[in-house]
Amino acid sequence: MTYKLKISYDGSFFRGYAKQKDENLITVQSELEKYLSLFFNTKISTFGSGRTDKYVHAIDQTVSFKCDSDYDPKSIQNFLNSKLTNIYVNSIEKVPNSFHARFSIKSKTYMYVINTGEFDVFKQRYEYQYNKSIDIKKCEDIINLFIGTKDFLSFSTSKLENTTRTIRWIRIIKKNKKIYIFINGEGFLRNMVRMIVGIILTYCENKITYQEVLDLFKNPKKGSAVIKVPGCGLYLYRTIY
């Protein structure tokens, strides 16, 4: 029996999504598996649509797991929500055994939130406190450089050999003093979204030229984009299957 979970979590309280070698570190995956194993009275291993780093949030993370037991999904959901802290299970359903949260996914959308107004002490764990104006039109000048299937080695600290990824679209929305950057793609490398946003902001500040951004793709070098915005403003916004 395969179950599919849709969850949200506040990344401020976790050392990322994935389990760590140090079992004392609390992660989203370790907490989920602890209480799923308690419910089913057997060890449960889960698979997420992707890993989020520490302080990164999720509005729509998808998780799957297999188990021999057949339970009403609602009873599992109610149990988990009664035990979990800073994680909420939005839904659980039974799915075909071929479903896998990581390998069945078609695309993911990330959202990055920036506060361009005055520093907000109550939102500092949920928005990047940039605290200065952003020229949206200038930001949009370089968006097309990221769209398509490209080698994003310069925008990642990943150890993977294959660093080619596909970005489908990027949208920037301004609401009052907040800037929301949405990035949709088929897959992402570690720190890729945060480094893309970092370069967009650096370009807006006139600290890097259009040609220099272009060169990050023409001559890719691991992590050469350098600028990485804080994890607190990043949300896994939507997972599509």
Curated annotation (Swiss-Prot):
The gene is truA. This is tRNA pseudouridine synthase A. It catalyses: uridine(38/39/40) in tRNA = pseudouridine(38/39/40) in tRNA. InterPro entries: PsdUridine_synth_cat_dom_sf (IPR020103), PsdUridine_synth_TruA (IPR001406), PsdUridine_synth_TruA_a/b_dom (IPR020097), PsdUridine_synth_TruA_C (IPR020095), TruA/RsuA/RluB/E/F_N (IPR020094). It comes from the Bacteria. Keywords: Isomerase, tRNA processing. CDD domains: PseudoU_synth_EcTruA (cd02570). Substrate binds at residue 110. It comes from Malacoplasma penetrans (strain HF-2). One of its GO terms (biological process) is tRNA pseudouridine synthesis.
